[in-house]
């Protein structure tokens, strides 16, 4: 194509994404748009078409991003090129959302007509506003009996401050309002503004590993043109690759002769590892590089850590291969080998958050058939030592000797909890119990309140979300972002079985809660660990100080069963003999710890 045609084509491009809270109908709306523009034949259509991972469908969440090109002939007779970039809506994947939004000029904000605005809707809207996107509100699910579109319209205007007078009332499920949405995209979403003649700049917003072609980059071209045969360079690490193929997705990959400014598509350049291609990085040409990269790229750091161990120790290498394969598609997953006396060989893994951790664990078990034991999740603590050094510790077993520690700082998050008014008391009580500090509270409408707390991340990692849902009958929605590190009175608690430390059961706890936490755990373990032939003491210790103890009584055989009557000294001899045997057993015996014991430590609470 010559320059004129390229510029004309650029004016017809519309890049947009759909943002919504979980379950407000985002994937269904995407399905309808694909049907309406006849991108996918009705034979190939299946629900949640863009959620290609089995797990995404099952949980009804979007994890990986997908970008699709559609052609739409508008009422003005012109054919427009739409690029729909699907985003995950969950708090763990916020960075993924922000990158996919950076690849767009507009965003469709889907709000449920019955539920109204939720915490994650807000979080994602602010990301879209940060990226200067044109936001089009849509009120979805208007066919529900509980729908109240007018209330939601005023809510959008009051809480977010968007003009919702032209918000389309739609039902993605019933296919109502889809055409108006498409027309609004043409009118409201601006065309891409880049310069075709400038040096190439393309934003990587995702990367997928393909066994035959290596890493395939999903990119949005901001300036310039890229075609097969070009030599590209990644700006964060200056590595260069030769482009083998470029193309677009119509969910299937379709090769093209070039990608020009405004296009969203893929580049295959036989790149070996996803580690080279960080999401948010800028691709440019090695021969004529851009002067500076696109802004907004940041290295994603894991917030939550846990040990993963295969239940069968001979599966260790399989687990490593499985983690490496997952890492190919998920650069935010980090892992390194670690060993535990209790669990053998395994890996210490870092995750973006709890959902991310859950999803990875489930994919390992499901796609790679590896049964796992997972240790208690922990966060990164900053430990300041008495000699002036400081260190980051994410694994309780690596904590230095308590006498060498001056202070420990732990990460706090700013948690936004949206909840109906009647549950505010329950939410505040929960947040206080989790050592939260109240920040502020705003009324969204007559009934809903946005409560903001500063809560230690370590408290959220355990079971905050489940507790929040159960104390508010499922009505609360929750979003968090890391705010700062603060000094806290933290101690490391060890669990001893039969006098031996079980390293996998160690955890970090606040000093004020140490006693009750220790007592709870030893009582819980007492119920779970099967009785042995000898008595087993279970102790919770901080340093050398035992704070809680309970004993599992020994199983004993009735050695007197065959003495009918008879001399008492005969009975005593048999009992003494049994006692000596138990004693010897105790000194050499080891205790089997069942898997539930590790899990029970995770679900610690005042049950």
From Swiss-Prot:
Catalysed reaction equations from the record: GTP + H2O = GDP + phosphate + H(+)
Domain of life: Bacteria
GO molecular function: GTP binding; GTPase activity; ribosome binding; translation elongation factor activity
InterPro entries attached to this UniProt entry: EF-4, EFG_III/V, EFG_V-like, EFTu-like_2, G_TR_CS, LepA_C_sf, LepA_CTD, LepA_IV
GO biological process: positive regulation of translation
UniProt keyword annotations, A-Z: Cell membrane, GTP-binding, Hydrolase, Membrane, Nucleotide-binding, Protein biosynthesis
Pfam families listed in its UniProt record: EFG_C, GTP_EFTU, GTP_EFTU_D2, LepA_C
Protein's cellular compartments: Cell membrane
Limits of the tr-type G domain: 11-193
Listed GO CC annotations: plasma membrane
Binding site for GTP: 23-28, 140-143
Keyword Protein biosynthesis listed: yes
EC number: 3.6.5.n1
HAMAP family: LepA
Stated family: Belongs to the TRAFAC class translation factor GTPase superfamily. Classic translation factor GTPase family. LepA subfamily.
Its job: Required for accurate and efficient protein synthesis under certain stress conditions. May act as a fidelity factor of the translation reaction, by catalyzing a one-codon backward translocation of tRNAs on improperly translocated ribosomes. Back-translocation proceeds from a post-translocation (POST) complex to a pre-translocation (PRE) complex, thus giving elongation factor G a second chance to translocate the tRNAs correctly. Binds to ribosomes in a GTP-dependent manner.
NCBIfam families: lepA, small_GTP
UniProt protein name: Elongation factor 4
């Amino acid at each position: 194509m010559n320059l004129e045609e390229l510029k004309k084509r650029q004016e017809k491009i519309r890049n947009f994404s759909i943002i919504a809270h979980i379950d407000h109908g985002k994937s269904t709306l995407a399905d309808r748009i694909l049907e309406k523009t006849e991108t996918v034949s009705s034979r190939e259509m299946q629900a949640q078409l863009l959620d290609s991972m089995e797990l995404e469908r099952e949980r009804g969440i979007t994890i990986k991003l997908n970008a699709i090109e559609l052609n739409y002939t508008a009422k003005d007779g012109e054919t427009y090129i739409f690029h729909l970039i699907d985003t995950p809506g969950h708090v763990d994947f916020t960075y993924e959302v922000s990158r996919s939004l950076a690849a767009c000029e507009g965003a469709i904000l889907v709000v449920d007509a019955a539920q109204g605005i939720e915490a994650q809707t807000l979080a994602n809207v602010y990301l879209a506003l940060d990226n200067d996107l044109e936001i089009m509100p849509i009120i979805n699910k208007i066919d529900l009996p509980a729908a109240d579109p007018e209330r939601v319209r005023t809510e959008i205007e009051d809480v977010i401050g968007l003009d919702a007078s032209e918000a389309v009332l739609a039902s993605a499920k019933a296919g109502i309002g889809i055409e108006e949405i498409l027309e609004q995209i043409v009118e409201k979403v601006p065309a891409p503004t880049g310069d075709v003649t400038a040096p190439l700049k393309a934003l990587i917003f995702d990367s997928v590993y393909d066994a035959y072609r290596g890493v395939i980059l999903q990119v949005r071209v901001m300036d310039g043109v890229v075609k097969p045969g070009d030599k590209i360079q990644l700006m964060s690490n200056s590595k260069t690759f030769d482009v083998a193929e470029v193309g677009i997705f119509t969910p299937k990959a379709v090769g093209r002769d070039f990608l020009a400014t405004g296009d969203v598509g893929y580049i295959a350049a036989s790149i070996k590892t996803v580690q080279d291609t960080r999401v948010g990085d800028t691709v440019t040409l090695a021969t004529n590089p851009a002067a500076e990269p696109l802004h907004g790229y940041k290295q994603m750091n894991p917030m939550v850590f846990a040990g993963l161990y295969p239940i069968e120790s001979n599966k260790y290498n399989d687990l490593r291969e499985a983690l490496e394969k997952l890492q190919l598609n998920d650069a935010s997953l980090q892992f390194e080998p670690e060993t535990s006396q209790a669990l053998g060989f395994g890996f210490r893994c870092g995750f973006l958050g709890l959902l991310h951790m859950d999803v990875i664990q489930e994919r390992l078990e499901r796609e790679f058939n590896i049964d796992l034991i997972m240790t208690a999740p922990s966060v990164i603590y900053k430990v300041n030592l008495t000699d002036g050094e400081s260190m980051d510790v994410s694994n309780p077993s690596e904590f230095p000797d308590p006498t060498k520690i001056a202070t420990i700082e732990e990460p706090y998050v700013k948690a936004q909890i949206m909840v109906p008014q009647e549950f505010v008391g329950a939410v505040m009580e929960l947040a206080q119990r989790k050592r939260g500090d109240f920040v502020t509270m705003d009324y969204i409408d007559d009934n809903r309140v946005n409560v903001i707390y500063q809560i230690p991340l370590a408290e959220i990692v355990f079971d905050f979300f489940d507790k929040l849902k159960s104390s508010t009958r499922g009505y609360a929605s929750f979003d968090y972002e890391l705010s700062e590190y603060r000094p806290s009175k933290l101690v490391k608690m060890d669990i001893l079985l039969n006098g031996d430390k079980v390293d996998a059961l160690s955890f970090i706890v606040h000093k004020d809660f140490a006693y009750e936490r220790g007592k709870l755990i030893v009582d819980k373990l007492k119920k779970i660990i099967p009785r042995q032939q000898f008595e087993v003491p279970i102790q919770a210790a901080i340093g050398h100080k035992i704070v809680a103890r309970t004993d599992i009584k020994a199983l004993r055989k009735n050695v007197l069963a065959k003495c009918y009557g008879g001399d008492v000294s005969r009975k005593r001899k048999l009992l003494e003999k049994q006692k000596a045997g138990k004693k010897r057993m105790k000194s050499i015996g080891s205790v089997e710890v069942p898997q539930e014991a590790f899990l029970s430590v995770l679900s610690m609470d005042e049950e």
